[in-house]
């Protein structure tokens, strides 16, 4: 990939919407696959009462729109200002209690797990029915649109074309607890070709530090898949 193309993919611009300032991709086609579109606000003329507590709007009880769902609420039911990274807002924005809770949970992904995905981890990678795995570093691209696999060869998988993400586990530790993560199974399509391509990532067991990083990467990728499916269903 040329540096010029890479820079074009990552270019961003600051825009002002009715909800606040947003840092969005210069080219819409290069937006994050985890992003959400701004909702259509419920028209003011249809907002006579708070959609949570049913308080009637008047001179003293003002209406506010939740920036995530677009519904209208009174100040008491829509007072929290919470980061909303999936819509690219620069500053925390007003959200109803239900949406604020969801956005706070997503903030953990952006603050912690996204960094893990961008840093990458090393796996034994098996393509399709091949019996010979290749040691490769897997990481998410800076614009969050591609999964890069680098070893003796280089592959780019477009995130939006991933259809299946499954963590592979084995056994249970002594004394109970969660099953041990050993890898991940992915299915994805390649534009211009028929059928589904399969990919298996296996954790390298002989390096403790590398294993911890690899398992953290698997967990982060599983969370990313959930956000991806939500964005598709919007």
Curated annotation (Swiss-Prot):
Gene: ZFYVE21
InterPro entries: FYVE-type_Zinc_Finger, ZFYVE21_C, ZFYVE21_C_sf, Znf_FYVE, Znf_FYVE-rel, Znf_FYVE_PHD, Znf_RING/FYVE/PHD
Binding site for Zn(2+) 1: 50, 53, 74, 77
Binding, Zn(2+) 2: 66, 69, 96, 99
Localization in the cell: Cell junction, Focal adhesion; Cytoplasmic vesicle; Endosome
Keyword annotations of the record: Cell junction, Cytoplasmic vesicle, Endosome, Metal-binding, Zinc, Zinc-finger
Entry's free-text remark on domains: The FYVE-type zinc finger mediates interaction with PTK2/FAK1, and also interaction with PI(3)P and association with endosomes.
The protein's assembly and partners: Interacts with PTK2/FAK1.
Pfam families listed in its UniProt record: FYVE, ZFYVE21_C
High-level lineage: Eukaryota, Metazoa, Chordata, Craniata, Vertebrata
A cellular component term, taken from the record's GO annotations: endosome
Role, per record: Plays a role in cell adhesion, and thereby in cell motility which requires repeated formation and disassembly of focal adhesions. Regulates microtubule-induced PTK2/FAK1 dephosphorylation, an event important for focal adhesion disassembly, as well as integrin beta-1/ITGB1 cell surface expression.
GO molecular function: zinc ion binding
Zinc finger (FYVE-type) in chain: 44-104
Name of the protein in its database record: Zinc finger FYVE domain-containing protein 21
Residue segments, region PH-like: 107-234
